[in-house]
Regions:
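Short, surface-exposed amphipathic charged segments that create phosphate/polyanion-binding patches used
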Residues: 119-122, 182-194
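A polyampholytic, Gly/Pro-enriched intrinsically disordered region
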Residues: 187-208
């Protein structure tokens, strides 16, 4: 059910399982990336998701406030208690995607709560490459929003053959936040919303 992280028992269960075998390689690596003297803190990946067994990698911009440890859940999760996660959970449910199908991530995985700059996107490229190495079953990359797309294009400059070599299907759409629909043109708003639904349907079709 959407926003399950608002439930303390659900959140506690996710915390207790954060080093379950399917997510341990990712979350142990996340532990290594946390550095108060470097780029700072980043959230774990919730064990609700597929971890290294996931077939789809979802990339957003950067971790939002609902991921913060102590304030939010401490996890990247489509069950976080915020509108963006709620929309993603709904879109997944509409097309038959399960949480285990997905590995959630960000173009810049450290918490900044603002648009990443060029240096940060470059750092994010290295993180995405390492994540793909950890998750060999990923077949689809879902880029949600302009920053996710920009980060992927920077990745392709370094590794132009990765899509072909890994057999990746790359799907682009708008960010699942409310702000992504901000426009005075009602037709454009509806087109953006429709594209988000289409993109999730494309992910589901690619995984069949």
């Amino acid at each position: 059910m959407p926003r399950s992280m608002a439930d303390l028992s659900f959140r506690r269960a996710q915390w207790e399982q954060r080093y379950a075998p399917h997510v341990a390689p990712v979350n142990c690596w996340v532990d290594e990336l946390r550095n108060p003297y470097g780029r700072g803190w980043l959230p774990d990946v919730a064990p609700l998701h597929g971890g290294v067994e996931a077939r789809a990698l979802s990339v957003l911009r950067d971790p939002g406030p609902a991921t913060q440890d102590g304030i939010g859940s401490g996890f990247l999760c489509t069950e976080n208690d915020d509108p963006t996660a709620e929309l993603m959970a709904g879109l997944m449910d509409e097309v038959g995607l399960a949480p285990v199908d997905l590995l959630p991530w960000n173009a810049y995985p450290w918490y900044i709560n603002q648009a990443p700059n060029a240096d940060q996107l470059d750092a994010g490229v290295e993180a995405v490459l390492h994540l793909l190495a950890l998750a060999p079953d990923v077949e689809v990359v879902l880029l949600q929003g302009g920053d996710a797309d920009h980060g992927w294009r920077r990745l392709l400059r370094r590794h132009p053959a990765i899509e072909r070599e890994r057999g990746l299907t790359v799907i682009r759409t708008f960010h699942p936040s409310r702000q992504a629909l901000w426009t005075r043109d009602p037709a454009e708003r509806e087109a953006r919303s429709a594209r988000r639904r289409e993109a999730f349907a494309e992910v589901a079709a690619a995984l069949r």
